[in-house]
């Protein structure tokens, strides 16, 4: 029996560019001060990392985070340079990207973690994204963020119950 390669997990923080301004999130995590690096530069680094690890019989597994990674204009280039076989990549996102975005990019990920932020998230859109990703056989994890503000707390509990009832 052939031995499976060892997995190296790599968390890639793109910056702090985000389309949300959540009250509970520290400003330095979404201030848009750390802009996205050049997509080709990162794509080259990703390609080098993939090649180097595979020469060591190791398989890379990337997790893309940072602000809101779906806003990174270089993400497609980065994903396309990961190698010719599907990697076990994870995307941590607020889920706000358009359905067109998801239709183009989902193939580069095996897992998507959606942070549901009650102050900004559109539940109907998030449900469409979740259903689409599940239909495409991706693992989907949902984090519903709560705050000390009563209105947001109640909304978070309500959204959690909706997601739980739908067995997400």
Predicted regions and their residues:
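Radical SAM/AdoMet-radical enzyme domain recognition
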Residues: 47-63, 72-159
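Generic alpha-helical hydrophobic packing signal
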Residues: 104, 167-168
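Active-site beta-strand/loop signature of hydrolases that rely on acidic residues for catalysis
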Residues: 66-67
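Basic phosphate/pyrophosphate-binding loop/patch that engages nucleotide-derived ligands
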Residues: 161-167
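Short, well-ordered coil loops that connect the C-terminus of an alpha-helix to the N-terminus
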Residues: 20, 84-85, 165
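Short boundary motifs at domain starts and secondary-structure transition points
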Residues: 1-4, 52-54
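Canonical Radical SAM [4Fe-4S] cluster-binding loop centered on the CxxxCxxC motif
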Residues: 2-44
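Phosphate/oxyanion-binding active-site loops and adjacent basic polyanion-contact surfaces
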Residues: 38-42, 71, 122
């Amino acid at each position: 029996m052939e031995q499976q390669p060892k997995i190296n997990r790599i968390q890639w923080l793109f910056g702090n560019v985000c389309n949300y301004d959540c009250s509970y999130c520290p400003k330095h995590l979404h201030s848009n001060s750390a802009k996205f690096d050049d997509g080709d530069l990162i794509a080259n680094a990703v390609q080098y990392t993939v090649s180097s690890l595979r020469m060591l019989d190791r398989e890379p597994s990337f997790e893309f985070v940072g602000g809101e990674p779906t806003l990174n204009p270089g993400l497609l280039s980065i994903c396309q340079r990961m190698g010719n076989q599907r990697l076990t990549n994870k995307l941590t996102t607020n889920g706000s990207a358009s359905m067109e975005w998801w239709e183009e990019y989902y193939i580069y990920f095996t897992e998507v973690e959606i942070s549901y932020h009650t102050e900004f998230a559109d539940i109907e859109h998030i449900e469409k994204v979740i259903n689409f990703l599940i239909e495409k056989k991706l693992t989907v994890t949902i984090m519903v963020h709560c705050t000390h503000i009563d209105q947001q707390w109640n909304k978070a509990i309500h959204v959690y119950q909706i997601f739980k009832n739908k067995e997400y």
